[in-house]
């Protein structure tokens, strides 16, 4: 390892720390206590998840489905080593009102996607280029962005 190289195990540990902070276990790195994505979603009913926060804004259900889709896309593309176009707009166009059962399924699917991303981080022995390394880091950045969107929407929804 050269002096300017990050050991894979350090990157893996850092990714797990940031993924856990974002999704499940706030340690105070960049979130306040009880504000991780899963903790936040546990406070949202299906009715609240179905509410668009503006005339053209997505529902919270769409936000959550989009996060899972993003994670699944990164996982599939990094594992395949191929980056093919996907329809990023489909979820925004099609996800509106959800039933309680549908909402629980959306949240469960997100948990599964999160587990797959953590496994991807563990399964990757080296990050061969900026694209794959950036893709891994973007899972945290992208999810944190949508967590912020969801938490801001809750200010309106839970008046």
Give the location of each predicted region:
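Short, contiguous alpha-helical
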Residues: 2-41, 46-91, 126-159
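Acidic/histidine-rich alpha-helical segments that form the ligand environment
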Residues: 93-127, 134-139, 143
């Amino acid at each position: 390892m050269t002096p300017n190289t990050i050991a894979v195990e350090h990157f893996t540990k850092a990714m797990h720390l940031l993924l856990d902070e974002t999704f499940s276990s706030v340690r105070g790195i960049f979130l306040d206590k009880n504000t991780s994505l899963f903790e936040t979603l546990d406070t949202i009913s299906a009715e609240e998840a179905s509410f668009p926060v503006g005339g053209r804004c997505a529902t919270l259900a769409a936000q959550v489905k989009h996060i899972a889709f993003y994670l699944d896309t990164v996982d599939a593309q990094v594992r395949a080593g191929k980056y093919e176009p996907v329809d990023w707009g489909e979820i925004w166009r099609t996800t509106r009102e959800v039933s309680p059962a549908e909402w629980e399924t959306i949240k469960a699917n997100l948990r599964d996607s999160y587990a797959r991303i953590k496994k991807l981080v563990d399964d990757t022995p080296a990050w061969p280029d900026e694209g794959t390394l950036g893709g891994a880091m973007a899972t945290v950045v992208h999810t944190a962005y949508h967590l912020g969107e969801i938490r801001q929407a809750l200010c309106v929804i839970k008046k």
